Amino acid sequence: MHLNTLKPAEGAKKLAKRKGRGQGSGNGKMAGRGHKGQKSRSGGMPKIGFEGGQMPLQRRLPKVGFTSRKSAYAAEIRLDVLSSVDSDVIDLPALKAANLVSEKIKTVKVINSGEMKKAVKISGLKVTAGAKATIEAAGGSVEV
C-alpha cells in the first residue's frame, strides 16, 4: 500500500446534482423550480418575515423594554461567593483579583443570597440592608 494508491471507499464521495444541464441528467430545463413565478427566478424569494402584504408579526407586536447600559459596568455579588475570597478586606480590586468580576466593572453591590461563613470587612462596595445584617451577624463589618 502506498499513499498514491489510496482511494475513498465506493459511494463515500457522492457527486453533486448538476441542475439545468440538459434533460438527460433528470434535472434539466426547469432545474426543479417549476414554471414561472417569483420563486422560479434568480434571487426570487420574498424577504424573511414577509406575509404577502399583511402586516408582519414583528411589526404587529409592540416594542418592549430596553437593554440597560448600566449592566456593562455594574455587577452583583452574592454573600456565599464572598466567602470564597481569600482577602480579609473585600473591595473592588480584591474581587477583580479573585476573578469574581471582570476588569470593566466599576460598581459592585453585595446582595443577601446564601450564607456568610466567615467574618470579612467590606470596603467601598454597595451593600443591601439584608446583606449588611448578615455580614455583621457573622462578625464582619461594612465600610462605605
Swiss-Prot record:
InterPro entries: Ribosomal_uL15 (IPR030878), Ribosomal_uL15/eL18 (IPR021131), Ribosomal_uL15/eL18_sf (IPR036227), Ribosomal_uL15_bac-type (IPR005749). The keyword Disulfide bond does not apply. The keyword RNA-binding applies. GO terms for biological process: translation. Pfam families: Ribosomal_L27A. One of its GO terms (molecular function) is structural constituent of ribosome. Residues 22-31 have a biased composition (Gly residues). Belongs to the universal ribosomal protein uL15 family. This is Large ribosomal subunit protein uL15. It comes from Hydrogenovibrio crunogenus (strain DSM 25203 / XCL-2).
